[in-house]
């Protein structure tokens, strides 16, 4: 049996993201984000679903194991480190990510947490900037939404 969740991004950068996970295993994120500047944009799960102060109140990257920032394929990374999405010349990014660390169940579930799309490219912790090992030097927060259980 699969578990499904959804996240709706609103504002000038908007979209719908669908999450699907089989009972045990990787979680797949699919969807589309529009209104972006063409190029790569950091794409992360943040620790809180609190959007009372816009994306700022969503906290830092979801990092229950207290690791440094990294790429999705790295063994050492934040759970919420999903790398980058790439917007085409029309400003639309098609999302199709399968990740082994995010989960829709259990103690470290991402349900109720926020997805954040960033202004710049995530350097995956390898850029040598002061904030590379914490945020991937991905810049400001363009859009966010809370991940919720899908009734379908």
From Swiss-Prot:
Domain of life: Eukaryota
Reaction(s) the record says it catalyses: 2 superoxide + 2 H(+) = H2O2 + O2
Binding of Cu cation, residues: 44, 46, 61, 118
Disulfides per UniProt: 55-144
Keyword Repeat: no
Reported cofactor(s): Cu cation; Zn(2+)
EC number: 1.15.1.1
Regulation of its activity: Inhibited by KCN and diethyldithiocarbamate.
Positions carrying N-acetylserine: 2
Location (main, coarse): cytoplasm
Cofactor: how bound: Binds 1 copper ion per subunit.
InterPro entries in the record: SOD-like_Cu/Zn_dom_sf, SOD_Cu/Zn_/chaperone, SOD_Cu/Zn_BS, SOD_Cu_Zn_dom
Keywords annotated in UniProt: Acetylation, Antioxidant, Copper, Cytoplasm, Disulfide bond, Metal-binding, Oxidoreductase, Zinc
Gene Ontology cellular-component terms listed: cytoplasm
MF GO annotations: copper ion binding; superoxide dismutase activity
Gene3D superfamilies tied to this protein: Superoxide dismutase, copper/zinc binding domain
Pfam families, A to Z: Sod_Cu
Sequence positions that bind Zn(2+): 61, 69, 78, 81
Subcellular location: Cytoplasm
Function summary: Destroys radicals which are normally produced within the cells and which are toxic to biological systems. The plasma superoxide dismutase has phagocytosis-stimulating activity and may play an important role in the biological defenses of the organism.
Family: Belongs to the Cu-Zn superoxide dismutase family.
Protein name in the entry: Superoxide dismutase [Cu-Zn]
Organism: Halocynthia roretzi (Sea squirt)
């Amino acid at each position: 049996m699969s578990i499904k969740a959804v996240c709706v991004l609103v504002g000038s950068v908007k979209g719908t993201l669908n999450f699907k996970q089989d009972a045990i295993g990787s979680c797949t994120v699919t969807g589309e984000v529009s209104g972006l500047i063409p190029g790569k944009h950091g794409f992360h799960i943040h620790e809180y679903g609190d959007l009372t102060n816009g994306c700022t109140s969503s906290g830092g990257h979801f990092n229950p194991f207290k690791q440094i920032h990294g790429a999705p394929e790295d063994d050492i990374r934040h759970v919420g480190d999903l790398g980058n999405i790439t917007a085409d010349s029309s400003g639309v990014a098609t999302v199709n990510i399968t990740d082994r660390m995010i989960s829709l169940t259990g103690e470290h579930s991402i349900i109720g947490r926020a997805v954040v799309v960033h202004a710049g490219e995530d350097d995956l912790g390898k850029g040598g900037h002061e904030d590379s090992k914490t945020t991937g030097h991905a810049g400001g927060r363009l859009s966010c939404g809370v991940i919720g259980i899908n009734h379908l």
